[in-house]
């Protein structure tokens, strides 16, 4: 059992397996691939649902300090682009704080706010960090258009996309910066990096 957030109880996903839609998929798979392959595929699916699926273990203080020190030698700068629209205060604060507590600090957080109310602006203004750039957008163009508005103000080497209610683990930017630095040593330029682990 994992005492940290993100834990799912053992076997909690069994209800998903036993749904009628999955039964139909199993019959289709059986007809297409035979009984032996269908049996092994079903067993693998059931076994994977029995396991503890999510168990995030945070960084130790020693690891955080190591990353901070190593990151000082990196040159890459990230522009984190966040479209904001009527975001609840608790979610907005959690997102901002997950960025500000990164072990790699060479970034700018660009918040493009298309909210009708002034509440998100007040929350953002309460943070006195020069890495935060707030831009008010007059017209809400949706997530893509608002993100493009934020991109217009980016000065970093890489643009990072983040939703207004997303969270980053403390080492998310460090992991990206470390990979970019490794590529530089290998005389390779990375055009894009992606991780679905840091949400």
What would you call each of these model-derived segments?
Residues 28-98:
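N-proximal low-complexity "stem/linker" segments adjacent to membrane-targeting elements
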Residues 97-106:
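Short, acidic, metal-binding catalytic loop of nucleotide-sugar glycosyltransferases
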Residues 113-122, 139:
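A conserved acidic beta->alpha catalytic loop
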Residues 120, 143, 147, 172:
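Conserved donor sugar-nucleotide recognition element shared by glycan-biosynthetic enzymes
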Residues 137-154:
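Glycine-rich, basic loop-to-helix element that forms the pyrophosphate-binding segment
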Residues 159:
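Short aromatic/hydrophobic "clamp" motif used to bind/position activated sugar donors
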Residues 163-167, 196:
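The conserved acidic donor/metal-binding loop of glycosyltransferases
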Residues 171-199:
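Conserved donor NDP-sugar-binding/catalytic core segment of glycosyltransferases
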């Amino acid at each position: 059992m994992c005492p940290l957030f993100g834990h799912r109880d053992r076997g909690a996903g069994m209800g998903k397996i036993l749904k009628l839609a999955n039964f139909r998929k199993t019959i289709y798979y059986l007809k297409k691939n035979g009984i032996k392959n269908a049996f092994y595929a079903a067993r693998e699916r059931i076994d994977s649902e029995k396991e503890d699926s999510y168990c995030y273990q945070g960084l130790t203080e020693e690891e955080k300090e190591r990353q901070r020190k190593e990151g000082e030698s990196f040159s890459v700068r990230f522009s984190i682009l966040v479209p904001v629209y009527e975001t609840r205060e608790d979610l907005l604060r959690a997102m901002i704080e997950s960025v500000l507590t990164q072990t790699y600090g060479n970034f700018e957080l660009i918040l493009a706010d298309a909210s009708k109310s002034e509440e998100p602006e007040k929350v953002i203004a309460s943070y006195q960090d020069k890495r935060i750039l707030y831009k008010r957008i007059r017209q809400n163009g949706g997530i893509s258009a608002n993100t493009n508005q934020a991109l217009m103000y980016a000065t970093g080497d890489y643009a990072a996309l983040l939703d207004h209610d997303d969270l980053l683990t403390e080492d998310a930017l460090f992991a990206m910066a470390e990979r970019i630095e490794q590529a530089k040593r290998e005389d390779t330029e990375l055009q894009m990096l992606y991780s679905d682990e840091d949400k």
